[in-house]
């Protein structure tokens, strides 16, 4: 099973260079499993026992499996994110240098490790709006060839280059497109050729750089995987596998994958939006349930906020908490933070531990050092719209936000097993703080 999951994950990531492509790949998985696509602008007809999904902005997706015995139901939700740190093309992106080079003007998206983007084959991918008569239609594009490079400055020209020189995204991080002057509109022309449309009919583009390097298994025992965008496509994929596998007729099982986590989630398609609430409420309404039943269901509901975690780095062990160290290939990570950057508390941790015990999956505990700010994720942000008990979990990895990250191969199977058990469980709240599982 381990080899199959790794192979499926690496294929998934290779086809998902942007959040738009991630959602397209998730849609493919759902379509093959018999899900019906819904549209937010249309009336929903929902039936017990059926499976549905809906997208927003082509970069966020929520899928739902409706049980058949919903007299006493709750929502079982997993939430991950579809985006990863990258560089986004600006409008009028072409820059001419010395009447020789054509560079591309970009800006940072998310908190990437800039140095890891040097000296790698890169290309462009994203979403393009194309005029077709009186319609504007969405097209996804992926330039599937080595198109760009951001070369390092030679050490002979900067003897302090290994001493932590700050990198300026406007100066140091611009990619080379060509060794000749291509002029304004070169990118639009290239994209038009890729899509087989006229340049004049391209009315908008959201284009990002992506790392072309393929995934590899490495280590003495092939125990690691190196790959772009493991944060958070590793969780997005493995939680989808569990979602598709599990059966439960007494719940409404929900899979959510949001965009824009890397830039704060505050968009119409981010975790801070009404997207999750809108879908849950409309599902409830279409099933003939009233507001009282909806509120009761939410009170018994549970969410797994799935986003990768920092494993102990062997070269920087002092960067990890003294008593809460996590390691690759040793189980799912439960993340906690006193300042509520993570949603985990005694209740949600206890519930998830019971689920993992049933699934025979090991767990680890992560906390930041008390003198390090650390990062945050989407769980507590989503709670501002629809509040339910939530635990923040993830898979341990190294080099988070690098252009090429590392994780353990065993942990993916652990996540699939735990998520499958979660979706198959029946979590019900008897009273505040008391649950049946």
Regions found by a protein language model. Name each.
Residues 1-437:
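N-terminal hydrophobic/helix-forming segments and targeting peptides
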């Amino acid at each position: 099973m381990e080899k199959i999951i790794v192979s499926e994950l690496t294929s998934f990531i290779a086809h998902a260079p942007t959040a738009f492509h991630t959602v397209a790949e998730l849609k493919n998985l759902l379509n093959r499993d018999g899900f019906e696509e819904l549209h937010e602008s249309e009336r929903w007809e929902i039936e017990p026992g059926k499976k549905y999904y809906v997208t927003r902005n082509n970069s966020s997706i929520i899928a739902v499996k409706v049980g058949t015995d919903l007299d006493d139901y709750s929502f079982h939700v997993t939430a991950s994110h579809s985006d990863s740190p990258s560089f986004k093309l600006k409008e009028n992106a072409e820059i001419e240098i010395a009447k020789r080079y054509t560079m591309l003007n970009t800006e940072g998206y998310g908190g990437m490790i800039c140095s890891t983007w040097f000296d790698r084959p890169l290309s462009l991918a994203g979403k393009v709006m194309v005029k077709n008569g009186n319609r504007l239609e969405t097209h996804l594009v992926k330039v599937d060839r080595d198109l760009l490079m951001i070369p390092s400055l030679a050490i002979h020209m900067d003897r302090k280059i290994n001493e932590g020189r700050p990198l300026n995204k406007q100066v140091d991080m611009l990619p080379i497109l060509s060794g000749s002057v291509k002029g304004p509109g070169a990118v639009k022309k290239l994209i038009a050729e890729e899509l087989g449309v006229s340049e004049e009919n391209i009315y908008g583009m959201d284009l990002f750089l992506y790392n072309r390097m393929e995934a590899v298994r490495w280590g003495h025992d092939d125990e690691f995987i190196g790959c772009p965008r493991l944060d958070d496509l590793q969780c997005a994929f493995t939680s989808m596998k569990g979602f598709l596998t599990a059966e439960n007729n007494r719940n409404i099982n929900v899979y959510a994958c949001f965009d824009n986590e890397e830039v704060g989630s505050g968009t119409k398609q981010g975790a801070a939006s009404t997207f999750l609430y809108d879908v849950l409420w409309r599902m409830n309404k279409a099933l003939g349930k009233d507001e009282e039943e909806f509120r009761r269901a939410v009170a018994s509901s549970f969410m797994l906020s799935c986003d990768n975690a920092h494993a102990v780095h062997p070269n920087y062990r002092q960067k990890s908490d003294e008593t809460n160290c996590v390691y690759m290939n040793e189980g799912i990570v439960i993340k906690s933070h006193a300042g509520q950057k993570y949603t985990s508390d005694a209740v949600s941790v206890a519930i998830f531990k019971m689920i993992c015990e049933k699934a025979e999956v090991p767990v680890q505990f992560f906390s930041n050092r008390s003198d390090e700010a650390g990062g945050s994720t989407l769980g507590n942000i989503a709670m501002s719209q629809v509040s339910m008990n939530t635990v923040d979990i993830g898979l341990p990895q190294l080099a988070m936000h690098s252009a090429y990250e590392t994780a353990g191969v065993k942990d993916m199977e652990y996540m699939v097993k735990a998520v499958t058990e979660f979706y198959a469980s029946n979590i019900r709240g008897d009273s505040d703080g008391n649950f049946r599982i």
